[in-house]
Amino acid sequence: MKHEHPDRLMNRTPLSLAALETHDAFAERHIGPDAASQQAMLDTLGFASRAALIDAVIPASIRRAEALPLGPFAQPKSEAEALAALRALADKNQVFRSYIGQGYYDSHTPAVILRNVLENPAWYTAYTPYQPEISQGRLEALLNFQQMVVDLTGLAISNASLLDEATAAAEAMTLLQRTGKPKSNVFYVADDVLPQTLEVVRTRALPIGIEVKTGPAAEAAQAGAFGVLLQYPGVNGDVRDYRALTDAIHAAGGHVVVAADLLALTVLTPPGEWGADVAVGNTQRFGVPMGFGGPHAAYMAVRDEFKRQMPGRLVGVTVDAQGKPALRLALQTREQHIRREKATSNVCTAQALLAIMASMYAVYHGPHGLKTIALRVNRIAALLAAGVKQLGFTTVNDTFFDTLTIDAGARTAQLHAFANAKRINLRRVSDTQVGVSVDETTTRDDLADLLAVFAQAAGGTAPDVDALDAGLPGVAALPAGLERTSAYLTHHVFNRHHSETEMLRYLRSLSDKDLALDRSMIPLGSCTMKLNATSEMLPVTWPEFGRIHPFAPSEQTAGYREMIDQLEQMLVAATGYAAVSLQPNAGSQGEYAGLLVIHAYHASRGEAHRDVCLIPASAHGTNPASAHMAGMKVVVVACDAQGNVDIADLKAKAEQHANDLAAIMITYPSTHGVFEQNVREICEIVHAHGGQVYVDGANMNAMVGLTAPGQFGGDVSHLNLHKTFCIPHGGGGPGVGPVAVGPHLAKFLPNQRSTGYARGEEGIGAVSAAPYGSASILPISWMYIAMMGAKNLTAATETAILNANYIAKRLAPHYPVLYSGPGGLVAHECILDLRPIKETSGITVDDVAKRLMDYGFHAPTMSFPVPGTLMVEPTESESQEELDRFIAAMIAIREEIRAVEEGRADREDNPLRHAPHTAAVVTANEWPHAYSREQAAYPVASLVTNKYWPPVGRADNAYGDRNLFCSCVPMSEYA
């Protein structure tokens, strides 16, 4: 309920406290149009109320009969109340000094990066840089990431982030299987690889028929494997010389993947220099908090011959229309949004924001700073090794970078108890061994405390740190011949911005190049670019969430687990399902997990042969890519002229494949932006033929509070918390893709047995490296739901539908709306058909998208799900004023097109064909165009006082792919 204006309240006496409460205040901040604006839009649509509109849009047969059953969160909390409640949960976590290692380390996030990247909406509210001209800042930051990875690994080319180290290793496995055309189906994993990585690799291998073998690294060449995974350094700390082994593996016809620690590579010979084919790993220790497991940016680097088979996004250099350097996403034909089931991966949302943070950590410290950090870490480990040896303990590994495995024998349990008393976590290697992994946050005092713990267990006196330091030689415990001699990070960007002043200005210069939600609406269909409220974002940087190791003892993570349990129940309420897993760390991974759950269900019933997945022709590209990864055969179901699933074709395909039908994957509302009237019938047809129904949750923003997939026939869905539930897109990640299931599938949800996290014996294997995936950003969605409450979450959904229908109604006279439901209404998005315009004027959807940049807007989704169209999704967060500004821009562009159609403007020399227009072009001495500079730069009057200038002209995509270059550009190129 909208609280009343204070002037009206002041006229009443007496005032009550209840009348002055503002529990709904956040909803008014989140939902853009106020009551008057909503009524004006409803009047335009011909409806008396929002409820009447919703009744006309959503089929009555699937409407929720009850309010969202949010229990204690049904009533909204104010921002202050929600923050206080979450703070109480955070305070239940215990922040110990964690030396567990196993791929996760405490780190210092430089304050200038914390404030100006992680906490800066110019960075975290941006979308994936598919429109390169308005994404040059984050593209440069991601190119820096690629250069950093290439330099440190010694390989030829790197992508712009993957989800985590474990899934990166799994992607490397499938890359080698694709490219090598191997006779073998064996992938060999050395026994000192991180245990969580091994588990994810096994999960990925099983449905596609790869046999995973494990054993000593030394035996890898005899395994007959098409690929071998090595850890460098190993999980127990060993640093091994793998040169001879790599040669032997190659001689046997195999390839080598190395999971490498980037900080260690500043002092160790990089894998590319000793023959590795692929390197993968995590960049978390480059200034990104542990966050109970994520999010963190993984990396992959490969030899040149594998570049066109790499998964994920790749930033490349091209030229713009003026011949100046410009950045863009390269080789996109590898990706799921184009190649679908033939894609190199199902990755869509990755970890762009975290990759940017890691790259800026390298920029800020530079090569000398990184090496100093690495040498200091190694020195502390060496001093610890010397100290524990003095106390009578034996170190299992004689070579190390930052990790020691120590044989404590019968004193092991006592050692853990003494450490616990000092709020220290050690790794529990076995009943007789402990592991200690130090990091850049480990201080001299921390080292003294560690030595004191070992001394207490030994019944002796802790050695003096200074005395140990004085008696220890220079660089310790690195194998002879493995100390790095090659230069790295030589590009000027890593050697210039080392003062905070320079770094601050560099970050500002990059963010100024980009168009994010802090400047204007981003009406991308199927992407739900809604408000990421500041109060939702604040807890992400709390140390009680950030400094928790994912494998910390459960008694230290009580607050996290309570918050996660509450969020899971919130999502159960929203979806109508029975159980939720938050482990998948992207929507694509949630899809994949859901399909594995379906397979496990069929297998439990003796029907493991069911492997056909029906997918409508309009589906998002991740659907067929995920189905292929899950070992399923994709059978496409046609759509009818209205964009709905063709029921006759569905019946025929379901009947044809009745014996082996596993599932159907549908999106609801459909990818055409319509609530299909026959969704229950679709579900019934599939169930009748033995299949399960997967409802893609990408469009959940049109359903929350109004309908629920678990109630109209769905068996499993993934959600996108970075869409519906307010986690920001971060320029291409992070995301969270929970998988929600019906009661019959709950016992099959993902486990992580390697770390002791198990939901049940029948659960599928881990799909992410950490038990709860990207846990540290889950508070964002918790805050959103807590501050909205049941009623306002429903109101948000209704407003999203209202805004979309308002845009469709206003633009219909200018651009045909391709699909609609009864009464000409759409769901939360609409598709504008630009194909007739191309026929009459030669103007393409790409031209319109680029011209929108001159008007200060990011284009809607281009050519999905129908080529030659724009899909518009305004979300509930945009005000009527902003909607009207976008509508005015689209109408003005239509008039520019009409000028071409009528011959008043040239078919080639017009503002659309040459868009976007940079400041340099508009202010140049020569102006070669028939249209004016003013029309180019200021096509509407409002831009005169608030103008965003695209930093580059139109990027030449074909040139960039023909001349692939994915490293930092020399400064001379910008002259």
Swiss-Prot record:
Domain of life of the source: Bacteria
Name of the protein: Glycine dehydrogenase (decarboxylating)
Reaction catalysed by this enzyme: N(6)-[(R)-lipoyl]-L-lysyl-[glycine-cleavage complex H protein] + glycine + H(+) = N(6)-[(R)-S(8)-aminomethyldihydrolipoyl]-L-lysyl-[glycine-cleavage complex H protein] + CO2
Entry-linked InterPro entries: GcvP, GDC-P_C, GDC-P_N, GDC_P, PyrdxlP-dep_Trfase, PyrdxlP-dep_Trfase_major, PyrdxlP-dep_Trfase_small
Source lineage: Bacteria, Pseudomonadati, Pseudomonadota, Betaproteobacteria, Burkholderiales
Residues bearing the modification N6-(pyridoxal phosphate)lysine: K723
EC number: 1.4.4.2
Function: The glycine cleavage system catalyzes the degradation of glycine. The P protein binds the alpha-amino group of glycine through its pyridoxal phosphate cofactor; CO(2) is released and the remaining methylamine moiety is then transferred to the lipoamide cofactor of the H protein.
